[in-house]
A protein has these predicted regions:
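Amphipathic alpha-helical and helix-coil boundary elements used as assembly
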Residues: 1-453
Length: 453
């Protein structure tokens, strides 16, 4: 609950009305709760009552009250219960009201509700208020004993014989005293049947407007992404809100097993951030975070002609959209980047350490060419956790060139040219423990100097 734009008296007065508690000033004391003892004053029409009238009304008292509890995503509901009253006039008015207004209206609870028992209690209070509003007594008299919160018994003289008829006991809910300069006195009062436990009083609820606030805590104990904030008017008293939710452009859960939580955009404001606070139903007791605000100490804008859009985390990881260059850049604080250039069609990935690509199957396709450049290039592995079984290099023309040396090593080595095989070099050496050369039909060797030994 929140005291908002109201004095302490008005705040307590509003709470007493919302929770169905008595709160009144009897002329000498400020009373909270129904007094344990109430003075009863007898008033006789024609003696100390000069005028009197009864008013009975029917009203839509058939209602369903609801309240949403976000912590467990549950809508609590309750229908207004029947009222046990000893007043025959109140019973008649309620019966006629239910007959006329058969279809229940639906309305949100006037207070914040935590569980079903509190919802049922609130519904009982609302029904009690409706019952008390159906019957009203107005009277003018001259008894100074008529005070706010007292009970009065109304009596009328019998018509055919001496004595008085009792016309019921009433609770004084409003009284005005008038004293003239000549010493004459009178009062006017309003009263309801004393059988009513709840006074039919409704206090105006303040209408909350959007507020600026600073985030004090974002470590939600329930892990729901909520924050605690401090509005500007709470700073001098070091107050803060309860855990409140944060509005985001997209939020929900998955419709299947893939995503059960945090579907959408998850951006929880950081401690110290300035945020804008809104209120459900304009109720100061139901705040939530609209969004975050830049201010003069931290804002730099979107550059010339607002061409730069970006998202940056507190660690410095940044996604930048540059409409001037038509590029998208993902970068970290240490210079690791993924750069997409729409104009040239180029995508560049840069890292100051290493880049790893892991997958069950990987395909690299270049419609024109693929270049792999490095001082040292290794393809495959002979040992380790995942040794390479097969390496295939295929193409219409395959060239392997070493500026200084080129080596091919294996337990079994086969070099095959289906049409022609040529070994060529300035000097050719072959050393083997055993060599066998077979020519199917012909072997020709020629040299200016041939030595076979």
């Amino acid at each position: 609950m929140c005291q908002y734009g109201e004095s302490s008296f008005d705040f307590i007065n509003r709470l007493s009305a919302e929770y169905g508690e008595w709160f009144f000033y009897d002329g000498s004391d400020l009373c909270f709760g129904r007094p344990s003892k109430q003075e009863n004053v007898e008033l006789v029409y024609g003696s100390n009552i000069s005028s009197m009238n009864y008013a009975m009304q029917i009203l839509p008292s058939n209602a369903d009250i609801y309240s949403y509890k976000s912590s467990d995503d549950n809508v609590l509901m309750a229908s207004l219960p029947s009222v046990d009253t000893t007043s025959s006039l109140t019973k008649t008015a309620l019966k006629r009201s239910d007959e006329l207004y058969r279809k229940p209206i639906k309305q949100p609870a006037a207070i914040r509700i935590s569980d079903q028992s509190q919802m049922d209690a609130h519904a009982k209070v609302q029904k009690g208020k409706d019952a008390a509003r159906t019957m009203l007594l107005k009277a003018t008299g001259d008894s100074p004993k008529v005070l706010l919160g007292n009970n009065v018994t109304i009596k009328l003289s019998k018509l055919s014989k001496p004595g008085f008829d009792d016309h019921g006991e009433y609770l004084v809910t409003n009284v005005s005293h008038f004293l003239t300069g000549t010493g004459s006195y009178k009062n006017t009062m309003e009263a309801i049947p004393s059988a009513n436990e709840i006074i039919p009083f409704t206090a105006a609820k303040p209408v909350a407007q959007t507020q600026m606030a600073v985030v004090l805590n974002n470590n939600d104990p329930k892990g729901m992404g909520r924050v605690q904030v401090q509005m500007l008017w709470q700073q001098d008293t070091h107050q803060k809100t309860d855990w409140i939710r944060v509005m985001t452009p997209d939020a929900g859960g998955g419709k299947g097993k893939d995503v059960s939580k945090n579907r959408g955009q998850v951006f929880v404001p950081e401690v110290g951030d300035q945020v804008l606070i809104g209120f459900r139903y304009n109720d100061p007791s139901r705040p939530f975070v609209f969004g975050s605000l830049f201010h003069g100490s931290i804002a730099s804008g979107g550059g010339k002609q607002n061409e730069i859009k970006s998202m940056t985390t507190k660690a410095g990881s940044t996604l930048i959209f540059n409409d001037t260059d038509h590029t998208v850049r993902l970068q970290t604080s240490k210079g690791n980047t993924v750069h997409v250039n729409e104009k040239s069609g180029a995508i560049t990935i840069s890292s100051g350490s290493s880049i790893s690509i892991n997958s069950k199957n990987i395909s690299i396709n270049g419609s024109e060419s693929i270049n792999i450049l490095s001082p040292k290039i290794t393809i495959g592995s002979l040992g380790g956790e995942h040794p390479t079984d097969t390496v295939d290099v295929m193409g219409k023309a395959v060239t392997v060139e070493g500026e200084d040396t080129a080596g091919v090593k294996s337990k079994a080595l086969t070099l095959e040219g289906t049409d022609e095989y040529t070994d060529k070099g300035g000097k050719y050496s072959a050393e083997m423990s055993e060599m066998q050369i077979n020519g199917g039909s012909k072997i020709a060797m020629s040299s200016s100097d041939t030595d076979i030994s």
